[in-house]
Amino acid sequence: MARISAHVIDAIADRVDLVSLVGNYTHLERRGDDWWGRCPFHHERTPSFHVVPDKKMYYCFGCGVGGSTIKFFMEIEKIDFHEAAVRLAKRAGIEMSFEDGVHAPSAHASFTMQLCEVYQRIAETFHHVLMHTAQGARARAYLASRKVTDDSIRTFKLGYAPPDPVWLFQFLRHKGYSPEFLARSGLFAKKSERIAVFSDRIMYPIADRYGQVIAFGARALGTAPAKYLNTADMPQYKKGEHLFAFHCALSQMRKTRAAIICEGYMDVIAFHQAQLTYAVAPLGALLTKSQARLMRSFVDRIYMCFDADGAGRAATYKAILLCRSLGFEVRIVELNGGTDPAECACIEGEDALRKSVERSTTDAQYLIRCARHEHSHLGADDTSRAVSFLFPYLSVLDSAIQREQVMQDIAMAFGIRIQAVHADYLRYVSRTTQKGTTGNCVLSVQGTAIQVKEPATGVRTAQLRLVLAVVANPELFELLRESVCADDFEDPMAKELFIILEECYRADTRASPHVLSCCTTDELRKLVSEAIVCGEFSCNAPQIVRDGVALVRRNRLLKERESLVGRLRRFGDASSGEECGSMQELMMEKQRVDEELERLKGVRK
């Protein structure tokens, strides 16, 4: 693959605002010249993720991840360097160029970008059909009957797929898309590649956090066998990693530090029309860990509003455990008569939705009520079974005080002593611990979610510290290179880093992003990121480098002296004139080394 030219990497670093980019994934707050937030790569309560705009670098003191603008985008989007650079350059309006003048993107990257393009195009086309054509009249009437406003149709880019199942194939062929590409696009039936998956349906575009359409949900208007259809997982879309309307809700999520999670597209729209514009929906039956973590950096409180039927209660229970394990506060929104939010808004008005959120209950109150409902169908001897329903919830609470309070509420609700609840809970914990597993899939999430890794920066030798000081202060590299060379370094990472700095110096690309892009291991990248961001070498760097250079030179001279002494010993008592001459040369060389070592002592003092 062609190597991206250095000036493009420089342009990305200069023109892509790292604070804004990171801000799409976690909430940042300014402290002095830098920005801090919760790390988007691991679960944490106290912000330890540090962004330094003037150095165009980030670093997490909790898990040790760090790097440049391109590195962040690579890691957060799970793509390679080439694709990350191309996508960032496109977003910033930077013309791509390559060292050999040839751009050869990977087949996967090219296919993914083409998929995003075609999904965005047809979302706009479906929206036009809905809003401005006679074919869309029936769909407009349906949405009006559900009290969906024109403003909401525009906000969510709702559309209508015409009833002719061949129309979309012909439309896209006319736009220049090949039959081979369309067959792989996820838009057409596998057994009949001209037949559209979506026809005669209300279309709900699913977008990523930037508003780029990547998939569709669809509701049939006619008598189709499947009332609802959704895009299958594709290279650009994994349903368990996205939330419907996340890009629309993100701004208000940041302001309120809250999110409403409901079940369906129409439920989300109903909440937004009620000015509760921080509502989103999972794209499946259950909220996933990836979806919950998507909100974690922006949200402290989750309002859950799932259906009141058995499946809805089960989904609520699992979502509570998951969100609690990730540190969210959770409240439950319950609607009158067991209606869903869209029905509630239609029947009782938008104010009813707002009031339902205001009177939401805690997750503990909700679960205790569910347990008591279960107890009402059991015999008196089965109270323990109903109470044990709550033990997984107790396990995901990270506060002992909170856990004790919930135990008191359980005891009061069931008319039993708190000591009995506590004893049964301890037995439950003991059993799950002995098995080496929690016995509950969501409890196992807890162990992963709250684990915070120590930075894997390893032990830093004096040589490595010297080179890291130069990495953090690249203007000092000339001072380093005029005194030492790569072979003077015994530490392998220090040697590798010196070689990288030398290559960047010769290419006149000593900026941090270039140094990072040349690092061959994650450990070295973490060391470099930490050195640049942490500020350890921001004070007295020239003296650190001078002392380090003196130490490297001293080690080199000591090795040279040891070699000379060994050679002198081998001469023994020189007899011939030639041997005497050679021995004299070695002694003079040793004297020179000794004098140099004495001078270095003076420098170090």
UniProtKB/Swiss-Prot annotation:
<feature type="binding site">
    <location>
        <position position="307"/>
    </location>
    <ligand>
        <name>Mg(2+) 2</name>
    </ligand>
</feature>
<keyword id="KW-0479">Metal-binding</keyword>
<comment type="subunit">
    <text>Monomer. Interacts with DnaB.</text>
</comment>
<dbReference type="Pfam" id="PF13155">
    <property type="entry name" value="Toprim_2"/>
</dbReference>
<dbReference type="GO" id="GO:0000428">
    <property type="term" value="C:DNA-directed RNA polymerase complex"/>
</dbReference>
<keyword id="KW-0862">Zinc</keyword>
<keyword id="KW-0808">Transferase</keyword>
<keyword id="KW-0235">DNA replication</keyword>
<keyword id="KW-0460">Magnesium</keyword>
<keyword id="KW-0863">Zinc-finger</keyword>
<keyword id="KW-0548">Nucleotidyltransferase</keyword>
<keyword id="KW-0639">Primosome</keyword>
<dbReference type="InterPro" id="IPR002694">
    <property type="entry name" value="Znf_CHC2"/>
</dbReference>
<dbReference type="GO" id="GO:0006269">
    <property type="term" value="P:DNA replication, synthesis of primer"/>
</dbReference>
<protein>
    <recommendedName>
        <fullName>DNA primase</fullName>
        <ecNumber>2.7.7.101</ecNumber>
    </recommendedName>
</protein>
<keyword id="KW-0804">Transcription</keyword>
<dbReference type="InterPro" id="IPR034151">
    <property type="entry name" value="TOPRIM_DnaG_bac"/>
</dbReference>
<dbReference type="GO" id="GO:0003899">
    <property type="term" value="F:DNA-directed RNA polymerase activity"/>
</dbReference>
<dbReference type="GO" id="GO:0005737">
    <property type="term" value="C:cytoplasm"/>
</dbReference>
<dbReference type="InterPro" id="IPR006171">
    <property type="entry name" value="TOPRIM_dom"/>
</dbReference>
<dbReference type="GO" id="GO:0003677">
    <property type="term" value="F:DNA binding"/>
</dbReference>
<dbReference type="Pfam" id="PF08275">
    <property type="entry name" value="DNAG_N"/>
</dbReference>
<comment type="similarity">
    <text>Belongs to the DnaG primase family.</text>
</comment>
<comment type="function">
    <text>RNA polymerase that catalyzes the synthesis of short RNA molecules used as primers for DNA polymerase during DNA replication.</text>
</comment>
<feature type="binding site">
    <location>
        <position position="309"/>
    </location>
    <ligand>
        <name>Mg(2+) 2</name>
    </ligand>
</feature>
<dbReference type="InterPro" id="IPR050219">
    <property type="entry name" value="DnaG_primase"/>
</dbReference>
<dbReference type="InterPro" id="IPR037068">
    <property type="entry name" value="DNA_primase_core_N_sf"/>
</dbReference>
<feature type="binding site">
    <location>
        <position position="307"/>
    </location>
    <ligand>
        <name>Mg(2+) 1</name>
    </ligand>
</feature>
<keyword id="KW-0240">DNA-directed RNA polymerase</keyword>
<dbReference type="GO" id="GO:0008270">
    <property type="term" value="F:zinc ion binding"/>
</dbReference>
<dbReference type="InterPro" id="IPR013264">
    <property type="entry name" value="DNAG_N"/>
</dbReference>
<feature type="domain" description="Toprim">
    <location>
        <begin position="257"/>
        <end position="338"/>
    </location>
</feature>
<dbReference type="InterPro" id="IPR030846">
    <property type="entry name" value="DnaG_bac"/>
</dbReference>
<keyword id="KW-0238">DNA-binding</keyword>
<dbReference type="InterPro" id="IPR036977">
    <property type="entry name" value="DNA_primase_Znf_CHC2"/>
</dbReference>
<dbReference type="Pfam" id="PF01807">
    <property type="entry name" value="Zn_ribbon_DnaG"/>
</dbReference>
<feature type="binding site">
    <location>
        <position position="263"/>
    </location>
    <ligand>
        <name>Mg(2+) 1</name>
    </ligand>
</feature>
<dbReference type="InterPro" id="IPR006295">
    <property type="entry name" value="DNA_primase_DnaG"/>
</dbReference>
<dbReference type="GO" id="GO:1990077">
    <property type="term" value="C:primosome complex"/>
</dbReference>
<feature type="zinc finger region" description="CHC2-type">
    <location>
        <begin position="39"/>
        <end position="63"/>
    </location>
</feature>
